């Protein structure tokens, strides 16, 4: 069985195929995170969707302490090596090292903003990264038959509830977990509107609203 744990904002731990994958591990300074970076004792892969501080977070330090492989866009991978991270895989969109890098509509200074698809144990997880809505989400859903989609809903910097609900319609996951909300005052403070829209329009999709620190086995 695979399991996803939410640390608040866009930070997740995915346990799948006997691997621990951390995504966007912004823990120290994250007002929603129930754990500190120093409490992460094991990780196999750390994936960072883009270089904004609320996503890159503690990734370098966690990789150096746990010997996890840092995976991100090429330019951000170069930065990781400069910071002393030993195991680095710098990829472009479409590239894969067991994780598939996907596009995201956002901004960043180093490399392209990305999402990621993780496969293992016959399960597939999609973390959309910080993104707006884009039509090729339909293609991702058709190609990868998603078990779980992790979707930003907070608005302002990413999709809001309406666009995120449409993303769910395009992706057609079995389950969706909302993220990237409530952390800052400018973001949506609740997932209620998103939950209502998905349940009304895609009733077959399971909406899983986690509290920080909670896990979803699948």
Label every PLM stretch briefly.
Residues 1-20, 27-30, 193-205, 209-214:
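Zn-dependent metallo-beta-lactamase
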Residues 22-24, 43-51, 70-74, 125-131, ...:
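Active-site neighborhood of phospho(di)ester-bond hydrolases with catalytic His/Asp-centered motifs
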Residues 3-6, 21-24, 99-104, 124-130:
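Active-site-proximal beta-strand elements of phosphoester/diester hydrolases
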Residues 29-30, 52-57, 77-80, 95-98, ...:
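Active-site environment of divalent metal-dependent phosphoester hydrolases
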Residues 105-170, 193:
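Active-site-proximal loop/helix segments of hydrolase catalytic cores
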Residues 49, 57-107:
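Glycine/small-residue-rich loop that forms an oxyanion/phosphate-binding "nest" at active or ligand-binding sites
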Residues 13-52, 57-64, 75, 105-109, ...:
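Pre-active-site segment of Zn-dependent metallo-hydrolases
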Residues 81-96, 163-165, 169-218:
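Binuclear metal-ion centers of metallo-dependent hydrolases, dominated by the metallo-beta-lactamase
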